[in-house]
UniProtKB/Swiss-Prot annotation:
GO terms for molecular function: ATP hydrolysis activity; magnesium ion binding; nucleotide binding; RNA binding. GO terms for cellular component: host cell cytoplasm. This is Non-structural protein 5. Residues 16-37, 53-72, 85-104 are annotated as: Disordered. Mg(2+) binds at D92. Belongs to the rotavirus NSP5 family. It comes from Rotavirus A (strain RVA/Monkey/United States/RRV/1975/G3P5B[3]) (RV-A). The modification Phosphoserine is found at S67, S154, S156, S164, S166. O-glycosylated. The keyword Transferase does not apply. The keyword Phosphoprotein applies. One of its GO terms (biological process) is viral genome replication. Homodimer. Interacts with VP1. Interacts with VP2. Interacts with NSP2; this interaction leads to up-regulation of NSP5 hyperphosphorylation and formation of virus factories. Interacts with NSP6. Interacts with host DCP1A, DCP1B, DDX6, EDC4, EIF2S1, AGO2 and CAPRIN1; these interactions are probably part of the sequestration of some host SGs and PBs proteins in viral factories.
Length: 198
């Protein structure tokens, strides 16, 4: 993506500031703006002292001491910004020329490369059952079969069970045989009820 910005509507500085670089007044005025005189490029102590002594104490501000070492700060600022009569400020100190006119037209290009790889595979399984069990009415409740239970007194003399499915008719109505047949009948009925329910 390329973005071009036209800054003609922004307040521009007249190119007359850049025309007289050699004079000390111009370099002093341009010290806080875009311009910077070439005489301050050499980062030696003599040039730094000359630069600081040429400014009044009222004009010396935080921008003149960007680091704890004033000489290092001066060297950084003087090498970072260089101008000539027809050039604007170049961040890489290249000699890009700009026409001398009262209206500046700068073009800024932004290069934006964005690569996004999204893997959005969503495996979802939703099972909705809309079958609702019907509430059993009281009549259905009454129609349920009541299976015989083997009570605690099932081995009494009154509890007589038919032994028609027995292998032989021996040992008729003994208490163990009664319990066995009652249990076997109960298991048959439970199995039949399960088959019907399924």
């Amino acid at each position: 993506m390329s973005l071009s910005i036209d800054v003609t509507s922004l307040p521009s500085i007249s190119s007359s500031i850049y025309k007289h670089e050699s004079s000390s007044t111009t370099s002093t005025l341009s010290g806080k703006s875009i311009g910077r005189s070439e005489q301050y490029v050499s980062p030696d102590a003599e040039a730094f002292n000359k630069y600081m002594l040429s400014k009044s104490p009222e004009d010396i501000g935080p921008s003149d001491s960007a680091s704890n070492d004033p000489l290092t700060s001066f060297s950084i600022r003087s090498n970072a910004v260089k101008t000539n009569a027809d050039a604007g400020v170049s961040m890489d100190s290249s000699t890009q020329s700009r026409p001398s006119s009262n209206v500046g037209c700068d073009q800024v290009d932004f290069s934006l490369s964005k690569g996004i790889k999204v893997n959005a595979n969503l495996d979802s399984s939703i099972s909705v059952s809309t079958v609702s069990k019907k509430e059993k009415s009281k009549s259905d409740h009454k129609n349920r079969k009541h299976y015989p239970r083997i009570e605690a007194d099932s081995d009494s003399d009154e509890y007589v069970l038919d032994d028609s499915d027995s292998d032989d008719g021996k040992c008729k109505n003994c208490k163990y045989k009664k319990k066995y047949f009652a249990l076997r009948m109960r298991m048959k009925q439970v199995a039949m009820q399960l088959i019907e329910d399924l």
